Structures are given as C-alpha cells and as structure tokens.
C-alpha cells in the first residue's frame, strides 16, 4: 500500500499536469538525496524555453500551514540543491534553462479524499549556483 507521502506526490503530479507542467521525473534519487518531482513549467517562457522546476512535496494532515522552515528546513533545502546539481550534470540539455526550487504543500485528511488546501510556493528557496 502506498504511503501518505506517495499518494500526496501522485496527487500533486496530476495537479501540476493540469496546470500545464510537464513531469520529467518523480522521486529522482542519487546518493546525495531525492527530489520528489522534476518538471518543466511551460506556463512561464524564458529565452531558453520553459523553467526547470525541482519540487519538494509535503503532505500534511489537517495542520496549520506556518513557517516554511518547519515544512522544509535549511539542511533539506541544501540536500535538494545538491541533488539538483547531480541531475543537471547528468542531463546537460537542461543546463541553460532557468531553474526554480518550489515547495508544494498538500493539506488533507488521512485518505486524501478531499484536499483541504494546496499551497504552491514558487521560488521557495535556494539557487543552484550558490
């Protein structure tokens, strides 16, 4: 049976597809970490095409949304940035694209029947070139 987090990630991948994102990878892993979703945001065009987005998905159960640091701390942000660098090293065709790090919070009940709220924090943290 899928975990709550996996179900939440699947729900968010569908939601992103409906919002004109192209999902490139789900649960992309290296020894440095994992990125929940890697997608192209086709809604925002740049000179090099769409925007390459590294997305961390958090599924919360009926809790209040508050400080971003409680949702994704600095250490987790650094791990995602490091993993994104590995993705770019292995997928050079994306190297000239604008890069964004997003956090999407799905607040729901335990069965994910009705999402109470989806909060999409674009450019939530980091910069791949720090």
Swiss-Prot record:
> Which SUPFAM superfamilies does this UniProt record tie to the protein?
Restriction endonuclease-like (SSF52980)
Tell me which Gene3D superfamilies the record gives. 3.40.1350.10
Please name the Pfam families in this protein's record.
UPF0102 (PF02021)
The superkingdom listed in its UniProt entry is Bacteria
Q: GO molecular function: any one?
A: nucleic acid binding
Q: Which InterPro entries match?
A: Restrct_endonuc-II-like, tRNA_endonuc-like_dom_sf, UPF0102_YraN-like
- HAMAP family to which the protein is assigned, alphabetical: UPF0102 (MF_00048)
Family the UniProt entry places it in: Belongs to the UPF0102 family.
Q: Which NCBIfam families match?
A: YraN family protein
Q: Which PANTHER family match?
A: UPF0102 PROTEIN YRAN (PTHR34039:SF1)
User: What protein am I looking at?
Assistant: UPF0102 protein TDE_2303
């Amino acid at each position: 049976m899928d975990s709550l987090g996996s179900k939440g990630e699947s729900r968010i991948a569908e939601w992103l597809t409906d919002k004109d994102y192209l999902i490139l990878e789900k649960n992309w892993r290296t020894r440095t970490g994992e990125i929940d979703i890697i997608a192209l945001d086709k809604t925002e065009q740049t000179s090099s095409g769409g925007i390459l987005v590294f997305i961390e998905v958090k599924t919360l159960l009926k809790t209040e949304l508050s400080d971003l640091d409680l949702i994704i701390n600095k250490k987790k942000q650094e791990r995602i940035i490091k993993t994104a660098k590995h993705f770019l090293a292995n997928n050079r065709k994306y190297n000239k694209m604008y890069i964004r790090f997003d956090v999407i919070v799905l607040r729901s009940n335990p069965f994910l029947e009705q999402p109470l709220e989806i909060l999409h924090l674009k450019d939530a943290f980091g910069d791949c070139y720090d």
